[in-house]
Amino acid sequence: MLQSTLDPNASAYDEAAATMSGKLDEINAELAKALAGGGPKYVDRHHARGNLTPRERIELLVDPDSPFLELSPLAAYGSNFQIGASLVTGIGAVCGVECMIVANDPTVKGGTSNPWTLRKILRANQIAFENRLPVISLVESGGADLPTQKEIFIPGGQMFRDLTRLSAAGIPTIALVFGNSTAGGAYVPGMSDHVVMIKERSKVFLAGPPLVKMATGEESDDESLGGAEMHARISGLADYFALDELDAIRIGRRIVARLNWIKQGPAPAPVTEPLFDAEELIGIVPPDLRIPFDPREVIARIVDGSEFDEFKPLYGSSLVTGWARLHGYPLGILANARGVLFSEESQKATQFIQLANRADTPLLFLHNTTGYMVGKDYEEGGMIKHGSMMINAVSNSTVPHISLLIGASYGAGHYGMCGRAYDPRFLFAWPSAKSAVMGGAQLSGVLSIVARAAAEARGQQVDEAADAAMRAAVEGQIEAESLPLVLSGMLYDDGVIDPRDTRTVLGMCLSAIANGPIKGTSNFGVFRM
């Protein structure tokens, strides 16, 4: 049973909470832009036509009063495209079955797909495939964003390949077509197992009337060329003919109810709430990430009953490892305690990951690391081979991994703690997180040392003012590029979450993971001893 020494009345807590709240406000301001879609003008126009927005459709599709875990909501932040990438993706329960829902937003440039839309769809498909989640596509899209077609067309074929591979793996794919599904978009219903179209609303064709006339000289209209009734009566592309949007959603729910879906993972044990208040998670991470904090304070507020069986507590103490349950699901946890990873921590992590694979237990990585230790003594002591051992174990582990960046995640430590490149099933960040090859001060300092050495080799004087300006510019650049808003916009995580929602988000992830089998491995790469 974990104990807590966190004092919510302390000034350090107040400062940390105020800083985190400020960062949350900044995140929420950007999320509001995604929620607004194309803005009041286009949303009102959409409603005036009798249509629902994608989030309204999702709300009616998922079970009443059940949560919806939205993924990649900040996609395209910092780009020339609307935040959210004209697409809503996430996991929700439909008739008790956890599904990946992918919904075009027609209020944003007609729901056309830009490069960030494609990345977001592919990430959603990857999550669905890895976790065995049925996919429901809520289709209303004008196809590719033509000005950026060179970035979309060639890689874009993967989203259709994904649908067929999902189907081949026994993972159902369902398309509810609410409006236009043209050109390449026509292959979304074409590649789906179940297709619902709406009377006088759904339009599915490879080429619209103007293009058909130009190519063949044939005169046609939307309805005769690709309307719902034609596809239901003649082409056979539509499996179900809905009268309106609500009817289409009703039919979609009935399709899911008839899937006879059975989870292949373990059933959860009875759930007990943590002993400590989740609201206090907002005041744990110091404003200055160089100040260490105890990750057990986080663990105590997210795991069932605040019960945590720590593994090797006296060895490699900069990394906390141990076993717990979260929303009833067994879980192994690796959490950075004092930033730097030494040889002992690397060996400890490697053994722990092997044990988790032996026990078929998912792993949660809580990031707050500046990387692996450097220096002559540590190089001689085998830091490279021990760090490589940990990365080897993370790379070849086959139990599901979830990563949560709560503080720093720098250098190869990001890799060893299962960063994005190591394919965690889910990766989220707190607003306090930062991730880069190294801290801004360190990187600018390295560049300064190199520049000074080069100047001395040429027999030149160092321009101190220019050096100071360079260091300030580089430090500012790295600081900006390491922030969660920027990284989330690039889809390097699956979302930036409120720390107080951590237990709920992780519980939903573990429940989604349990749709597929959980099986560890004993087949790791060669460990260099």
Curated annotation (Swiss-Prot):
Matches recorded under Pfam families: Carboxyl_trans
Biological-process GO terms, alphabetical: mycolic acid biosynthetic process
EC number: 2.1.3.-
Domain of life where this protein originates: Bacteria
Keywords carried by this UniProt record: Transferase
SUPFAM superfamilies, alphabetized: ClpP/crotonase (SSF52096)
Domain CoA carboxyltransferase N-terminal: 20-271
Annotated PANTHER family: ACETYL, PROPIONYL, PYRUVATE, AND GLUTACONYL CARBOXYLASE-RELATED, METHYLCROTONOYL-COA CARBOXYLASE
Its job: Component of a biotin-dependent acyl-CoA carboxylase complex. This subunit transfers the CO2 from carboxybiotin to the CoA ester substrate.
Name under which the protein is recorded: Probable biotin-dependent acyl-coenzyme A carboxylase beta2 subunit
Organism: Mycobacterium tuberculosis (strain ATCC 25618 / H37Rv)
Organism classification: Bacteria, Bacillati, Actinomycetota, Actinomycetes, Mycobacteriales
